[in-house]
Amino acid sequence: MHCPFCSETDTKVIDSRLVADGAQVRRRRECLTCHDRFTTFETAELVMPRVIKQDGTREPFDEEKLRAGLQRALEKRPVSVEAIESSVQNVKHYLQALGEREVKSLMIGEKVMEELRSLDQVAYVRFASVYRSFQDLSEFQQEIDRLQKPKPSPIK
């Protein structure tokens, strides 16, 4: 950490405390060169990755776009607003946990399909038909057949 008074990099932490209900760390520091003291605050940086679209363009992650896609698929389906919000948070957490600066929109779409599969199968097929650009009834049937197969349990 650079000293704000003399710009030297040699500083030491004198005191650390949690503040803002544990969301921040307040540190008292002392410059080892000029001996002035200063305070810093640290917070976790939870930045959402940029999205690489299929045409190669990049755009910031848009939570509203994610929510709108889920709501469109779940329109007139018996799924609560809380369940939709939980799915939005699950997708965001998944993307943050990847730790990547950029993710392909394909990866987000697959995660949304995973969420929809557990929420509502009709909404899942609805979303899949648009997402995967179904051209005829046989593609719908293939997706329905896939849904009816038991999902393999993860290896422990």
Swiss-Prot record:
| Name the UniProt record assigns to this protein | Transcriptional repressor NrdR
Matching PANTHER family: TRANSCRIPTIONAL REPRESSOR NRDR (PTHR30455:SF2)
- Pfam families xrefs: ATP-cone (PF03477), Zn_ribbon_NrdR (PF22811)
Question: Which species is listed as the source?
Answer: Saccharophagus degradans (strain 2-40 / ATCC 43961 / DSM 17024)
Names of the cofactor(s)? Zn(2+)
HAMAP family referenced in this protein's UniProt entry, alphabetically: NrdR
Question: GO annotations under biological process?
Answer: negative regulation of DNA-templated transcription
**PROSITE patterns membership:** ATP_CONE
Its gene name is nrdR
Q: Is Cell division among this UniProt entry's keywords?
A: no
What does the record note about the cofactor? Binds 1 zinc ion.
What does the similarity note say? Belongs to the NrdR family.
